[in-house]
Amino acid sequence: MMSVSLRMATVDDIESLFEIRTSVAQNHLSRKQMDELGITPQVLRSAINEGPCIWLAEVDRQPVAFSMIDRAEGEVFAMFVRPEHEKCGLGRLLMDAAEAELFKTHERIVLVTDGRPEIRANGFYQRLGWTVVERIDARDVRYEKRRPLL
């Protein structure tokens, strides 16, 4: 029986976050590509130090998935699961945590991702109640989700 836990990431987890991010097959980015996009260890360190914004899922104490929010923008900025840990409920757990935090201060939250049909994450987000509201470019789409009524 595997033991699953969810916790806030600390600066000590930065290397693990990059390892998880570069492990994915779909929407893959190398360290060099992330660097070119401004996604660097320094940027993650600043984000973590500004306030809790990254949830880390661990299986048997090993970091295997994470979600990250941009609180000011009301955006789920990232959600990645190591391929060998997909379809175990970790993505849903991480999205629930990110959404709950964003819904504290936003009525409507967003995420941007590769919207091509072959990208499996689209079906995942749609099953969680996210709706495509805009095509941003040839690849990316913007999803939106509204705070549930009580």
Where on the chain are the PLM-derived regions?
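Conserved N-terminal entry element of GNAT/NAT acetyltransferase domains
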Residues: 1-12, 148-150
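Acetyl-CoA-dependent GNAT
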Residues: 11-14, 18-84, 95-97, 101, ...
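Conserved hydrophobic beta-strand within the GNAT/NAT acetyltransferase core sheet
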Residues: 76-79, 109-113
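Active-site acidic-Proline motif in GNAT/NAT acetyltransferases
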Residues: 82-88, 117
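Conserved acetyl-CoA-binding loop-helix of GNAT-fold acetyltransferases
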Residues: 87-100, 123-127
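Conserved beta-strand-loop-alpha-helix junction that forms the acyl-donor binding cleft
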Residues: 110-122, 138-140
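Conserved acetyl-CoA-binding loop of GNAT-fold acetyltransferases
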Residues: 125-135
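Terminal substrate-recognition subdomain of acyl/acetyltransferases
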Residues: 138-150
